[in-house]
Amino acid sequence: MKRRDFIIKSSLAGAGIAVASNSAFDVPTIFTDSRTFLNTEKGELIFKPYFVQKGRGPHLGSVKSFETIGPSDWDFPSWAFASDTEWDAFYSNIFVTNDGVKISDTNGKEKFGINVRWNVEGFGYIYMTADNEGRFYELPETGKQKILNLNFELAKSRVAKNRERIDLFIKEGWQPSRDLKPFIDLSEEYLSDAIHVENNNEKCANLSQSSLYYSMWAGEKLEVEKAWFDIAKNNFRNEFFIGCDTKGFGRMDNDLFMELFTNAFDYATITHYLPRFQAEENIYTYGNRDEQFQLLREKGVTVEGRPIFWADECCTPDWLLNKSYSDVLKYVERHTREVVSHYGDEMYAWEIINEAHDFGNVMKLLPDQLVEIAKLIADVAKDTNPNVQRLINNCCINADYVQIWTPKETYKSSQIVTPHQFIKMCYEAGVDFTITGQQLYYQYTNRDLADTIRMTERLKKFGKPIQITEIGTTSGPTKETVESGKYELPNRPYSWHREWDQDLQADWLEQIYTILYSKPWIEAINWYDFVDPYSFIQNGGLLANPEGEKKEAYHRIIKLKDEWKKRAKQ
């Protein structure tokens, strides 16, 4: 089942489960306390948009109702949501109405920012954050109302963030290029003009929109420039992994697959989804996974296995779904020993748990339980093979999914968390993982390059190497996918720079890969998927078809590695 379909029909647990285990790797008994929910509503804060754009729009993302979200809404998220001072989304009563973006209940959080999809013509119809220049917003007193100019708030927040990055980068020896400086200067000048006419909402909004246009471009350009600056002053990173999944193996000629795969990649992930890998409990079907593994290792490709545990409906057979929690723990220990020992030292890493923070939780496990499952798997994997790396894989860094779950009590009882919060929980609980994994599909971040890397940087503080475990974007429609109805032609403004095509897919890949490669705390980037039509993102493969037709993005990966080496210090 697709994630967008799952979101429509799934719901979260409303109560905790007390558990016990006889395993050699016991976990603590878990109880979820009953809670009394307080009234946290205060005065109303309204962010009023001024639609100064020239096109037909839409220019501000909105949904009719959180109760009626459908597939098209999930494919192109457009709802507003609030975030805290650590940029973690949280449930609130924020909603876009005809009057603007309204919020009056932040669930007790004193300071917050808002996140909206806003159309900056010439750049994109994309998610961005207003956070009052990093000082954040507070709700008015009960019974009061305050109205802010949305255009102005977005502009001054983005300009402030750019200033912060520029100051940081200059301290590290970088200087903006002649090409970049006009974007920075114009964003500042237009914002200064907007401040001078702040009492004239229309004029302020127009000037703010111009500032926002230049600041969005400046934000991306300065991140890319700084990346190339860092690449040039450091040695080439021979140990950096460029990888991809192997789902195309067996769906195209295997010799052709191996040739094209190993020409581009030195890292591979082999999936072990239970419906095909373990349709019946304790009966393992390794199938061509062993063949893939052997061929890849012979070619010198480093391999990761994934996942040991994933509670999504797509990958949870009935025999596992029907287990008690204590029996799930016993199964997890047994399963971990089996797969880790099967491949031995030749397997570089195992993804111990996948997407445990989000709504794909058909087993209705609580965050604390998922943390304990991760801890158990990490301990058992290490006990089975101390040499294997242990990776936690998270998705949806934007965490907009937090807002679309309507039961307020669910959120107040903290039964869903962001990826950043889940890693923090694992770290604080002593989960013995060695790699932090984060997915960065464009269609699931819906953020520009600057926001994407800043969000990812929050993971540095946990002190683990970071892998971009899954990354990708579409190459746009093809004649076949349009005629078949699998890919609908857009009826809204483009989301990033222009409409997606093969060249834009390659441009996005080149820019975000360069930024990520330049960060010494990131050890790998893995594109998903290799070949269409088997890609998770529609038309998101590097090969256009199983016959091996190469897209521009495939060529760009190979050229990019050569360019990094050429520009490096040594």
Model regions: which residues?
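N-terminal substrate-binding region of glycoside hydrolase catalytic domains
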Residues: 60-103, 239-290, 295, 301-325, ...
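Substrate-binding cleft and catalytic face of glycoside hydrolase catalytic domains
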Residues: 269-279, 290-366, 371-399, 478-479
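N-terminal export signals
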Residues: 5-28
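Aromatic-lined carbohydrate-recognition surfaces of secreted/lumenal glycan-active proteins
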Residues: 243-247, 375-414, 467-471, 524-529
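Aromatic- and acid-rich polysaccharide-binding/catalytic face
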Residues: 262-275, 280, 348, 354, ...
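C-terminal segment of N-terminal export signals and the immediately downstream linker at the start
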Residues: 1, 21-44
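Amphipathic, heptad-repeat alpha-helical segments
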Residues: 37-87, 123-188
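Aromatic-rich peripheral "rim/lid" segments of glycoside hydrolase catalytic domains that contact
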Residues: 342, 351, 356-376, 380, ...
